[in-house]
């Protein structure tokens, strides 16, 4: 029986994916085998020694200490794409709303309460909110992952000309992307072409301030920018300067800050991107399935700190080893399995940066003594026998 601790409210649709005969779900345990989390801050949390996995029901993992988890042999999962439709729909909605000045117009309409000549006031006042149609306009999409590719495809369907930039596009994303999306190999070449720019990349040291003073100079005058990925991807002082000069005519974002609120041309939504019951259910289901498969079978899918390793069982016991990505590890591991007289039925080894994972199915005397010897290899962090 594995114990799963839930932090935050996890959708019951996801929890239902955990077999009650194998998993005990609790909010009170101090010694969980796995943790399901949404937004709770774990950065300063001391983890129990037997904690094996943390699954984040969402894409971002900046609330989880990844380096420390790797050092302790804790696999961290996220759920990329589970909330993609929710975010993409909001982006398209805000693209249209921002173009047609809907938020400001709707707010102004509320001020007409009690106006005896409302019809005349409407006809007179609507002129200040005239906006543009998006059909025939050019959209630049930075990042063509699960969300960016959906936004690009939707924009194509709405009659926009779409350019996409993503030097790291996955095979799956490429297959799902409309052939009508123009591929740009250089961001600086794409920016001058776009009436609208939407950004869909993770927040990393290398992506911080993707939109900055220099990139803004390359943009069309009057460009509109949408940021429903992470606030830090856009340099706020540079953006505000560009709004003041008219280089940027509109900024739609899901990340309000004191500096942005009340500024002309800025539309802030309160982090609504994934705030739908459907997205919460999808994230919870994916997180539950990931943590379940890892605890039961050692398979790793959508981990942010360990490589993806998924293999069907080949019989016998399964040995799962988290270790540092160093030369000679395979030979040290197989030397011990040979010494134990094991027959390896299946074996896979993959690495991710400085971490690696070796999983093998073997018949013979797979026991605690072997696990102890494997654990004694200096670069080995954790050994599990399933």
Where are these regions (language model features)?
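Rossmann-like adenosine-cofactor binding region
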Residues: 43-45, 167-260, 275
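Oxidoreductase and adenylate-handling cofactor-binding alpha/beta cores
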Residues: 88-107, 153-160, 286-299, 334-338, ...
């Amino acid at each position: 029986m594995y114990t799963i601790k839930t932090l935050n409210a996890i959708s019951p649709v996801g929890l239902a994916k955990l077999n009650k005969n194998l998993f005990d779900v609790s909010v009170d345990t101090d010694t969980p085998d796995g943790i399901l989390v949404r937004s709770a801050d774990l950065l300063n949390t001391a983890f129990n020694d037997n904690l094996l996995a943390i699954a984040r029901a969402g894409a971002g993992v900046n609330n989880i200490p990844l380096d420390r988890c790797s050092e302790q042999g804790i696999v961290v999962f996220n759920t990329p794409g589970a909330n993609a439709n929710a975010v993409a729909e909001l982006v398209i909605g805000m693209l249209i709303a921002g173009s047609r000045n809907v938020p400001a117009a709707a707010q102004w309409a509320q001020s007409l309460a009690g106006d005896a000549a409302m019809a005349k006031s409407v006809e007179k006042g609507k002129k200040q909110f005239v906006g543009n149609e998006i059909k025939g306009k050019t959209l630049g999409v930075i990042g063509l992952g699960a969300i960016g590719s959906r936004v690009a495809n939707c924009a194509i369907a709405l009659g926009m000309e779409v350019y996409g930039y993503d030097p790291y596009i996955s095979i799956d994303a490429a297959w799902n992307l409309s052939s009508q999306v123009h591929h740009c190999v250089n961001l600086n070449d794409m920016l001058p072409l776009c009436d609208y720019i939407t950004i869909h990349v993770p927040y990393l040291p290398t992506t911080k301030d993707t939109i900055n003073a220099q990139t803004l100079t390359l943009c069309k005058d009057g460009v509109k920018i949408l940021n429903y990925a992470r606030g830090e991807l856009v340099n706020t002082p540079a953006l505000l300067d560009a709004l003041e000069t008219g280089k940027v005519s509109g900024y739609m974002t899901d990340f309000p800050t004191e500096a942005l609120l009340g500024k002309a041309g800025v539309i802030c939504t309160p982090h609504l991107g994934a705030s739908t019951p459907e997205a919460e259910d999808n994230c919870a289901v994916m997180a539950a399935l990931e943590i379940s498969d890892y605890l039961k079978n050692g398979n790793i899918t959508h981990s942010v700190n360990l490589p993806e390793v998924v293999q069907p069982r080949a019989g016998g016991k399964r040995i799962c080893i988290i270790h540092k990505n160093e030369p000679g590890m395979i030979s040290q591991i197989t030397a011990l399995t040979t010494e134990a007289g094991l027959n390896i039925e299946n074996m896979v080894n993959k690495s991710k940066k400085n971490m690696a994972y070796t999983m093998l199915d073997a018949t013979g005397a797979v026991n605690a003594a072997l696990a102890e010897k494997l654990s004694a290899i200096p670069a080995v962090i954790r050994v599990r026998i399933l």
